[in-house]
């Protein structure tokens, strides 16, 4: 009877369950989208119970559709949208407020206040992160400050906080395990990535009671077992956890210092493994934990792009100038260039290296001759320019030149984007055979803990190249195009509307 690892990939817009066999090949996939809530401009929320029911649904579906029994599952790995924050009542199991999503800007005023009080460096020096609404800490404070009775309940020990991994493990284990892993803890603004513990000073600044917080574990170990009533009568080990971007780094077998991967999902995320030494950034990158394994912690530098694949979604759903995401490649290749049109997709601000949360999207260089093909091409190119911004910062901080870029995420299927990416960064872009690297990374972490796979070496040997895109553009063109992008970003940052 063949055995499998199940990966739960809980993302920003959907939950998926993916089965991997011993070869690391995909045996089955089930996916379910869930509702996005936008209560005010710039706010993004999810219903944590909807997330939970979507996860139960895909777990059931992937087994049923592929006629696999629950006793064929050796372990479960969880990878999750990071920073998204849930607080729930531990007695009733009910969330006290919607989950506040990583993209949400509703804690802007809290961040501003902490900066005004001069605390930015304190957070930076201990967590490797910036004081930005993106991270979980200010979201926790917001919920405690804004939900009636929440603070009192938290101080009495009746509430629990978790990122989505923590919430799912708590639910799957029937409330027995309140845990997270190093990679997720490192995204909270409350965890000291050098001392590897929740930081009392930061908790005081955010006014967050310590009893709210989960226990931090390695990224690969048996944390708990599923309750049999959640998993067809089986108690299956939950044995791997990593935030989505760290899971993708692991799934891309980026185990050596200097290895880099870039994910083109809803947002864009580049991570460089910096080994067992954290690298402090002078260029607006984040210092974060890649994973904890075998008693060691590996660190990473990370660049975050807030709008990547979601810009293509916007062309489809917002402007309705394409019918499907793949169609964007067709339109973009009908013209030789953007005809000097630049699009800066700063819908929710600009991430690395600018960290300008007040910037908003802008289009430059329009003329009477601009057609939709030019604009669609400019949108696709914007993903690549933002990636170069991050890559330059990364090389500068780490003093490591990036020689090849491993890529994953929905947009990598677009050959135009991949070729333009190679051209604009002047580096080979490697698209792997298995592009579900986030889910694969979680599966690898879970599988290592239960002996399904033996070692990182075995995993590294399984990585296979599908297509390599090599630079074709002249240095002159590359320099000119990128210079235009930098001007467009600069102009975007200047344009600010008063409240």
Swiss-Prot record:
Q: Which keywords has UniProt assigned to this entry?
A: ATP-binding, Glycerol metabolism, Kinase, Nucleotide-binding, Phosphoprotein, Transferase
Question: Can you tell me which residues bind sn-glycerol 3-phosphate?
Answer: 12, 82-83, 134, 244
Entry's Pfam families?
A: FGGY_C, FGGY_N
Q: Where does ATP bind?
A: 12-14, 266, 309, 313, 410
Entries under SUPFAM superfamilies matching the protein? Actin-like ATPase domain
Known regulation of activity:
Activated by phosphorylation and inhibited by fructose 1,6-bisphosphate (FBP).
Q: What class of enzyme is it?
A: transferase
Under Enzyme Commission nomenclature, its number is: 2.7.1.30
Q: Quick one: a GO cellular component term?
A: cytosol
In terms of Gene3D superfamilies, this protein maps to: 3.30.420.40
Q: Which GO terms describe its molecular function?
A: ATP binding; glycerol kinase activity
* Pathway linked to the protein: Polyol metabolism; glycerol degradation via glycerol kinase pathway; sn-glycerol 3-phosphate from glycerol: step 1/1
Q: Post-translation: what modifications?
A: The phosphoenolpyruvate-dependent sugar phosphotransferase system (PTS), including enzyme I, and histidine-containing protein (HPr) are required for the phosphorylation, which leads to the activation of the enzyme.
Q: Which family does it belong to?
A: Belongs to the FGGY kinase family.
Q: What does this protein do?
A: Key enzyme in the regulation of glycerol uptake and metabolism. Catalyzes the phosphorylation of glycerol to yield sn-glycerol 3-phosphate.
Entry protein name: Glycerol kinase
Q: Which organism is it from?
A: Staphylococcus haemolyticus (strain JCSC1435)
Gene name, per UniProt, is glpK
């Amino acid at each position: 009877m063949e055995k499998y690892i199940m990966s739960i990939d809980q993302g920003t817009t959907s939950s998926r369950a993916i089965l991997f066999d011993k070869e690391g090949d995909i045996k089955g996939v089930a996916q379910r989208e869930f509702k996005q809530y936008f209560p005010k401009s710039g706010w993004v929320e999810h219903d944590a119970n909807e997330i939970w029911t979507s996860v139960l649904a895909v777990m059931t579906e992937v087994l049923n559709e592929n006629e696999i029994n629950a006793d064929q599952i050796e372990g479960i790995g969880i990878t999750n949208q990071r920073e998204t924050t849930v607080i729930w009542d531990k007695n009733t199991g009910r969330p006290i407020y919607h989950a506040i999503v990583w993209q949400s800007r509703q804690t802007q005023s809290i961040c501003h206040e902490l900066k005004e009080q001069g605390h930015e460096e304190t957070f930076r020096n201990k967590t490797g992160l910036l004081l930005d609404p993106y991270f979980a800490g200010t979201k926790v404070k917001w919920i405690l400050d804004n939900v009636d009775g929440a603070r009192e309940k938290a101080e009495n020990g009746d509430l629990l906080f978790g990122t989505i991994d923590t919430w799912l493990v708590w639910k799957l284990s029937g409330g027995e395990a309140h845990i997270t892993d190093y990679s997720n803890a490192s995204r909270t603004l409350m965890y000291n990535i050098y001392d590897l513990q929740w930081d009392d000073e930061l908790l005081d600044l955010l006014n967050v009671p310590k009893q709210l917080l989960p226990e931090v574990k390695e990224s690969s170990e048996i944390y708990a077992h599923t309750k049999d009533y959640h998993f067809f009568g089986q108690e299956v080990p939950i044995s791997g956890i990593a935030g989505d971007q760290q899971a993708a780094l692991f799934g891309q077998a980026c185990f050596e210092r200097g290895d880099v991967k870039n994910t083109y999902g809803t947002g864009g995320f580049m991570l460089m493994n910096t080994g067992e030494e954290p690298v402090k950034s002078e260029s607006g990158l984040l210092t974060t934990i890649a994973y904890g394994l075998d008693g060691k912690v590996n660190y990473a530098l990370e660049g975050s792009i807030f709008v990547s694949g979601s810009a293509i979604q916007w062309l489809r759903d917002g402007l309705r100038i394409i019918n499907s995401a793949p169609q964007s490649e067709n339109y973009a290749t009908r013209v030789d260039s953007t005809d000097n049109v630049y699009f800066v997709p700063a819908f929710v601000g600009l991430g690395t290296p600018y960290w300008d949360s007040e910037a908003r999207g802008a289009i430059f260089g329009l003329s009477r001759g601009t057609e939709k093909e030019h604009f669609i091409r400019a949108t696709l190119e914007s993903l690549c320019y933002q990636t170069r911004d991050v890559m330059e910062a990364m090389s500068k901080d780490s003093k490591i030149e990036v020689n090849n870029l491993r890529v994953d995420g929905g947009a990598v299927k677009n050959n135009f984007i991949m070729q333009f990416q190679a051209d604009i960064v002047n580096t080979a872009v490697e698209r792997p055979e298995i592009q579900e690297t986030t889910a694969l990374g979680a599966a690898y972490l879970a599988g290592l803990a239960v002996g399904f796979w033996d070692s990182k070496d075995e995993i590294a040997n399984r990585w296979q190249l599908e297509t390599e895109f090599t630079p074709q553009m002249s240095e002159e063109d590359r320099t000119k195009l990128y210079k235009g992008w930098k001007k467009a970003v600069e102009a975007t940052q200047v344009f600010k509307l008063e409240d």
